[in-house]
């Protein structure tokens, strides 16, 4: 797999009221147990993730969690273990999804895609089980339950990846394949070539199970190839599990040329059951001990001096000198003005005003466990490009448990302002002219309403809030790994 994939390392080998709900398709019924008593002084919930890159050690979170991996036999067993240990609060909505994942876990036992080629696939008796598409609001535990499921899947050929990173990898593969084709001879028409099927075949040989976090479609280039790509993956026997903030019907809502995207929804539903996880609680915003002050307002007195002092204190613990650093990212150089060991001191301009992307932020996450990010502005539709980069940056930092110390112009809750200004309206008018769109036809498009950004901003605010907690800070300490 390409290095841009952010993979989950499986840790397991190392180490109420009678509410009922039914998963659409798999038929698994959930009967919620009475909530277990919570010990005094114990938090109801501890969010965690075991996602990391292949080259890094797993971000183990708690001794109880590791014990669960050693003694439990599936995601449902694991969930009950953590509840009894008062690491989690029993949530009937999560339990319903866990039961669906438990059923899929059992269905996957012994399943594998034959790697010998088309002939063996045609005569294989192993029919792939239906995957699962889990959707719901931010912070409800979608990523957590998928990570529990993933940790117990025993097949070797499995991948756990952020959906945005996966699509970046697909486009790179397409580009690489096209570059390898024979050049067109002068005077001859170039032969049309469809790279999607061979790319899907390539991915299928690498993974029988694909687990996607944050399944969302905002890019027209992605939208136009998804149906063909996933149709080929599914026909090759790949099983998909995905989490998303949106139901399948709302994917790429109001996007350009959405009519060409809609058939993908039917393909997704044909091969995946859908289940909603929506308890109405954002567990990332629960009351947990803060890790000191990690988020400053630029209007505060001496904020630069305070952050300088914090950097110096962390730098003293590093076996390195404070100096500029250059990281290599896919043949390019990513220059940082100030770093020391695994601590980097950056400005928003350095990381989000420049044309950087997920691969750059992933490389940062691999090299640094603590990053200072200064002078974050308030985001509106006028600076949506920088806002999207910031969202991608936080997603990568959060996935790899990078600790951040920030200064920003507004509190976290006010970082994203959904309001149109005159300059934004003028930019929209220019873009509408370039695309040949009328006012009426453009009114509902998400690229003009900012609808997709609003969904992503909600996730980012939720994650930034959790990143201020003592628990998150301790989990990001790589010196303990």
Curated annotation (Swiss-Prot):
Pfam families: AFG1_ATPase (PF03969). Gene3D superfamilies: P-loop containing nucleotide triphosphate hydrolases. Changing residue 143 to V: Reduces mitochondrial targeting. Increased amount of unprocessed protein form. Reduces mitochondrial targeting. GO terms for molecular function: ATP binding; ATP hydrolysis activity. It is found in: Mitochondrion membrane. One of its GO terms (cellular component) is mitochondrial membrane. Coiled coil: none annotated. Disulfide bonds: none annotated. Keywords: ATP-binding, Hydrolase, Membrane, Mitochondrion, Nucleotide-binding. GO terms for biological process: mitochondrial protein catabolic process; mitochondrial protein quality control; mitochondrion organization. Its EC number is 3.6.-.-. ATP binds at residues 136-143, 209-214. Belongs to the AFG1 ATPase family. Putative mitochondrial ATPase. Plays a role in mitochondrial morphology and mitochondrial protein metabolism. Promotes degradation of excess nuclear-encoded complex IV subunits (COX4I1, COX5A and COX6A1) and normal activity of complexes III and IV of the respiratory chain. Mediates mitochondrial translocation of TP53 and its transcription-independent apoptosis in response to genotoxic stress. Found in several complexes of 140-500 kDa. Interacts with YME1L1. Interacts with COX4I1. Interacts with COX5A. Interacts with TP53; mediates mitochondrial translocation of TP53 in response to genotoxic stress such as mitomycin C treatment. This is AFG1-like ATPase. It comes from Homo sapiens (Human). The lineage of its organism: Eukaryota, Metazoa, Chordata, Craniata, Vertebrata. The gene is AFG1L.
């Amino acid at each position: 797999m390409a290095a841009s994939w952010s993979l989950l390392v499986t840790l397991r080998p190392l180490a109420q009221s009678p509410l009922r709900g039914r998963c659409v398709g798999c038929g698994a019924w959930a009967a919620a147990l009475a909530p277990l008593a919570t010990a005094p002084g114990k938090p109801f919930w501890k969010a965690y993730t075991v996602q990391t890159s292949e080259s890094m050690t797993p971000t183990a979170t708690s001794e109880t969690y590791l014990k669960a991996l050693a003694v439990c036999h599936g995601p449902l067993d694991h969930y009950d273990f953590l509840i009894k240990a008062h690491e989690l609060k029993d949530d009937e909505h999560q339990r319903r999804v866990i039961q669906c994942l438990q059923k899929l876990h059992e269905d996957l036992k012994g399943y594998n895609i034959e790697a010998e080629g088309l002939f063996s696939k045609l005569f294989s008796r192993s029919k792939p089980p239906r995957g699962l598409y889990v959707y719901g609001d931010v912070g409800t535990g979608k990523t957590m339950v998928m990570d529990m499921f993933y940790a117990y899947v025993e097949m070797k050929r499995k991948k756990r990846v952020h959906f945005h990173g996966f699509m970046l990898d697909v486009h790179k593969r397409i580009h690489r394949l096209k570059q390898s084709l024979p050049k067109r001879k002068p005077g001859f028409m170039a032969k049309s070539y469809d790279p999607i099927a061979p790319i899907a075949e390539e991915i299928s040989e690498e993974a029988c199970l694909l687990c996607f976090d944050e399944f969302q479609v905002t890019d027209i280039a992605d939208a136009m190839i998804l149906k063909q790509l996933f149709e080929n993956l599914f026909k090759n026997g790949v099983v998909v599990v995905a989490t998303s903030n949106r139901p399948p019907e709302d994917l790429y809502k109001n996007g350009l040329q959405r009519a060409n995207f809609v058939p993908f929804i039917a393909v997704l539903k044909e091969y995946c059951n859908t289940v909603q996880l929506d308890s109405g609680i954002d567990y990332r915003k629960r009351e947990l001990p803060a890790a000191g002050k990690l988020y400053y307002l630029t209007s505060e007195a001496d904020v630069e001096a305070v952050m300088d002092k914090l950097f110096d204190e962390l730098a003293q613990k590093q076996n390195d000198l404070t100096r500029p650093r250059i990281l290599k990212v896919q043949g390019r150089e990513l220059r940082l003005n100030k770093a020391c060991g695994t601590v980097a001191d950056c400005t928003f301009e350095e990381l989000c005003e420049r044309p950087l992307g997920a691969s750059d932020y992933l490389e940062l996450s691999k090299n640094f466990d603590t990053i200072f990010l200064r002078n974050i502005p308030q985001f509106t539709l006028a600076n949506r490009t920088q806002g999207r980069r910031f969202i991608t940056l936080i997603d990568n930092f959060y996935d790899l448990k990078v600790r951040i110390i920030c200064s920003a112009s507004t509190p976290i809750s006010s970082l994203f302002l959904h309001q149109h200004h005159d300059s934004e309206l003028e930019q929209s008018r220019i873009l509408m002219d370039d695309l040949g769109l009328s006012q009426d036809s453009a009114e509902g498009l998400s690229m003009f309403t900012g609808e997709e950004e609003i969904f992503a901003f909600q996730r980012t605010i939720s994650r930034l809030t959790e990143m201020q907690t003592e628990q998150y800070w301790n989990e990001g300490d790589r010196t303990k790994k």
